[in-house]
């Protein structure tokens, strides 16, 4: 059974300095929009940079253009920080907005806001996603929210784009799954448009040994994405727009057949945030829950690393015999650190943790203001701060709430 956030202590609860990749960590600092209290959008979307002891060393405002707060706030290669929502915003360390683009920049668009992920692909180009409202009778009799990926210049020119509804057959859905999508639109709340794919990730492939060995599916610059409602991750070939690789989708009957066999870990349920590592493997946040057509149920979250050529799972982390204590069914993120550890979070609880290859938790932080979408560990040299002593004493695990807990613990952005 999951514990309530109120059952957890707050702040840093585990820290083994010699086994961590010591640095700074981004955490969301405020709760949801509250017009009754008069909390401003800037206050809603405040992000904190904390040290390994949980002390706030710097603060940012995320995306003041949206009352919901940014789903994403990350450091990019040039040292700036990007966020999304009603607009894409890039800011410097001091919070100066150096570039911004509203999601209504397309004259023919019905603005929905930039959702989930954004990637800065060069000094002047960005990958972003919106959800276009379309009628696609070849896919569904229900009006759909169709994921639309765009590469946009800093001048607001679209130089490349991709739509999900052009590629139905490439996702590998079974006939039964396609019939469910046709009848229901898939994935939506009652009375809403069909959220048939629900993409949540944009990741351009880095240089990797798979492409060096001649496998053109993994060409650097191709786009790795993730369909939460379709239970799969996939690669888009940049030059053609075709889906050239996917992994994780199985029909419900196939997963039942695999139950209790060695292949039972070869499928995904509601995944988020896949990333190709420099060894060519792919790291995934596999949420669990109940998604798919028809839904597949798995009530624990796991982190998995796969070999994309063989499909083999080469590393997996879940919470052992009490796996359901690590369950985040709607959001999540994962980051492989330079020392081989993995940073992730139990988003529903606001719990961030660093885990070794062997499955040992060597750092843990409980956000006193509850859940948020993603986190990021940033190296000391990448922040204009004097680095702390990298080997402070271990902190004991408190037996009480060490920090005040706000009344916004149920905050969680759209999955």
What are the residue ranges of the model-derived segments?
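Histidine-/acidic-rich catalytic cores in large beta-rich domains
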Residues: 1-415
